[in-house]
Curated annotation (Swiss-Prot):
The lineage of its organism: Eukaryota, Viridiplantae, Streptophyta, Embryophyta, Tracheophyta. Usually encoded in the trnK tRNA gene intron. Probably assists in splicing its own and other chloroplast group II introns. This is Maturase K. GO terms for cellular component: chloroplast. Keywords: Chloroplast, mRNA processing, Plastid, RNA-binding, tRNA processing. It holds the Pfam family Intron_maturas2. Belongs to the intron maturase 2 family. MatK subfamily. Its main location: plastid. HAMAP family: MatK (MF_01390). It is found in: Plastid, Chloroplast. The gene is matK. GO terms for molecular function: RNA binding. One of its GO terms (biological process) is mRNA processing.
Amino acid sequence: MKEFKRYLELDRSQQHDFVYPLLFQEYIYVLAHDHGLNRSILLENADYDNKFSLLIVKRLITQMDQQNHLIFSPNDSNQNPFLGHNTNLYSQMILEGFAVVVEIPFSLRLISSLEGKETVKSHKLRSIHSIFPFLEDKFSRLNYVLDILIPHSIHLEILVQTLRYWVKDASSLHLLRFFLHEYRNWNTRITPKESSFSFSKRNQRFFLFLYNFHVCESESIFVFLRNQSSHLRSISSGTFLERIYFYGKIEHFVKVFTKDFQDILWLFKDPFMHYVRYQGNSILASKGTSLLMNKWKYYLVNFWQCYFYMWCQPGRIQINQLSNHSLDFLGYLSSVRLNPSMVRSQMLENSFLIGNAIKKFDTIVPIIPLIGSLYKAKFCNVLGHPVSKPVWADLSDSDIIDRFGRIYRNLSHYHTGSLKKTSLYRIKYILRLSCARTLARKHRSTVRAFLKRLGSELLEEFFTEEEQVFDLTFQETYSTSQGLSRGRIWYLDIICINDLANHE
């Protein structure tokens, strides 16, 4: 953030909404390509002179402005004689700079709040790590949960129209439309994982900005309703979610519900309502009744249809009772199970046995999704039988063993939040045998002959159990007489592990 302030030198009170002139500043493209902010932006570089010329930027934007986007020819060439270079290449690079520029208004609002202009309540700024204490402390006290797949099929014009409430620079928004027309994907819909954007692979920053902005907008309804129902303005919400234009959308809600908008706010005053999002999924959990959750579902479906103008299938929102269903979230199967207990009550000469059921939060490791991930990575077949990994056969023996061992250690590390880890023994078996078959394939031998020659202990040391690592780490903290508690452990780095740990 300091680098942005030093290079941009914007007057936030007047100029932070006018970002279009920044596209003609060459250091923006240095920022976009991570050339480093400590060195001079005027450093001579042949690559830099050819790709980040101010003249090229001006010419390309002028050409895009004069182009007739209603006429498309399949024989159009990427080579433009006016520019003398590859137009698509320069469009890619300008879009990368645009991704940096369009983030500036959001960054400046955050900086102003952190500098003390607005007081930010720490409990309002939650990260992904706040999910773990929520599961531990709150989950067992809730009754119902809405399992939501965040809608993502949204037309790009809707995003541009919504973005103009944040960025009030019309020139920048027009340029964004030009870029989308340039790639002839104006009728494309945004998706979180697979996109038909021709620039999505090279411009991940811009693509992620659009998707995260869309998610931010879809979540804004929760902040708006909470503020309206409780009549308390959340200071931190003003930093991230400016709801100015939401008041103009109240008419849509009135038409949908055929009642006055204020009459339905009582539905959202539940103090036990919790909202959690992780990747493309979110949950809305409550201590309320099934009727309340159905009304929430009905409200969300209509909100997405009226505000984003997109069809949201009701099946994307599942209502589950925690006592009867397990929630597939964060790579775990989480549930609230009843732990029965009997209490003897003595009154004078009579004694009674009283049954008492205690709610307990429980997490298990889902074996089927894990095997499915191993199957996609070609460590086993669809039934879970280990197979060799031919693409790794050219590596050294130590590299092959290290790769297999690292995958298992990551999976074991990820699932330390579960008290029942029996499923991991199956995963360990698959990876160990797949590793042995890969080594045997490399040495043109059988698995039995290979292990007999080198010994099965060769693989054991690379598949260290997470519990053994935990013992080695904390053996000095706990006395051996008391033993080490085998409780649930949530590591804060689990979101950075490989795709297998995330079941993708």
